[in-house]
Amino acid sequence: MTLPRIDHIGVIVPDLQAAIGRLSALLGGLAPQCRDLPELDLHIAEFHTANLVIELIAYSGPAAFARGVMGGESGLNHVTLAVESVGAALERLAQAGFVAQPGFPRRGAHGSVAFFERDPATGLLFEICAPEARKEQP
């Protein structure tokens, strides 16, 4: 059996530049890959570490869809599991009692994605994604 792989963790921040500065200092000066997703009213900064991607997320506008999915509170927001097929994973997880949020699967920041309703046992949002190839950090 292949071990599951956590693709990334998502952290909502109120001030992206301040959060980048703090995380960069913590990670020894590592620079993030930054991008804007205007269709979702999001600014994202990704720190690629040896074993995990830390995704800092800042809302850039009303973000009706993104806020509805992820909520507005700052802090650790979601844990994302990499899967080969979002459709197959949705079926498997539905049988285990996970409920996909309305509007998923869809294209997201990391390829095909699906968010689930907030987990009552952990308080976290879980996301699955079939990641596209990422650019390597310089």
Model feature map: region roles:
Residues 1-42:
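Long, hydrophobic N-terminal alpha-helical segment
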Residues 1-2, 6-14, 45-48, 55, 67-87, 90-138:
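Vicinal oxygen chelate
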Residues 18-21, 86-91:
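Short, conserved charged micro-motifs
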Residues 32-34, 63-67:
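A short, acidic/glycine-rich surface segment
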Residues 37-40, 71, 106-109:
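A short beta-turn/loop motif at secondary-structure boundaries
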Residues 48-49, 57-62:
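A glycine-rich, hydrophobic loop/mini-helix early in the fold
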